[in-house]
């Protein structure tokens, strides 16, 4: 299972991730990396994706997937991918651009930058990162960086997980992804968590945090085992 971090201005480091350990305890190799766009490797590395989401970051992630696919303990024909927030964005971007993964779970994702501009609590800072303005000023640029534009070609079974009180990536982002996948004829499900914010995986109600993990594992088991 390829795990992609959120942010994108965050990074993976030497700390305990209960989610990774949970999947590993159920028989999966969990692998992760820090692509361009995140922190920890200098300003040039961090700003490499500004104005080009889905460009250098996607390239780095695919190179890492290539590397892992050559490992003797990895079955390259049974690879899954998941992530939340920016990691959810990249998960949808990946399944819209390659069919190499056999299963995907996109969590609290960005799906459409155009509609999100008017509904998210951080559209003001995103304009800075995207080097864009409003949709009226930068429609083509925002649309071209939106995963939903490319979901019509995907073949990857994809589970959508979203939280109904998410103000960062509003629920309509998950709804758009689900509808696009259904129209493409892809195997998909939409899991909605009521009352939960963007940070369900960290601060959500305990039973719902457990349910989220079980939904991811269920989906991966269905297509990878």
Where are these regions (language model features)?
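Active-site-proximal cap/loop segments of hydrolase catalytic domains
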Residues: 3, 10, 17-20, 24-25, ...
């Amino acid at each position: 299972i390829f795990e992609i971090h959120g942010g994108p201005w965050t990074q993976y480091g030497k700390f305990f991730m209960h989610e990774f350990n949970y999947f590993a305890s159920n028989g999966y190799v969990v692998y992760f990396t820090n692509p361009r766009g995140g922190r920890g490797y200098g300003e040039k590395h961090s700003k490499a994706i500004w104005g080009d989401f889905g460009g250098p970051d996607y390239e780095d992630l695919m190179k890492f997937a290539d590397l892992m696919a050559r490992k003797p303990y990895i079955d390259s024909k049974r690879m899954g991918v998941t992530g939340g927030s920016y990691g959810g964005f990249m998960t949808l971007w990946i399944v819209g651009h390659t069919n190499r993964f056999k299963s995907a779970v996109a969590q609290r994702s960005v799906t459409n930058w155009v509609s999100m501009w008017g509904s998210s609590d951080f559209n003001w800072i995103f304009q800075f990162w995207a080097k864009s303005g409003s949709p009226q000023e930068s429609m083509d640029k925002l649309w071209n960086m939106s995963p939903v534009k490319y979901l019509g070609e995907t073949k990857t079974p994809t589970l959508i997980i979203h939280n109904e009180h998410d103000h960062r990536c509003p629920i309509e982002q998950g709804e758009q992804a689900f509808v696009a996948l259904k129209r493409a004829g892809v195997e998909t499900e939409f899991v909605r968590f009521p009352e939960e914010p963007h940070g369900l995986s960290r601060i959500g109600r305990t039973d719902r945090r457990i349910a989220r993990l079980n939904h991811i594992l269920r989906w991966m088991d269905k297509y990878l085992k």
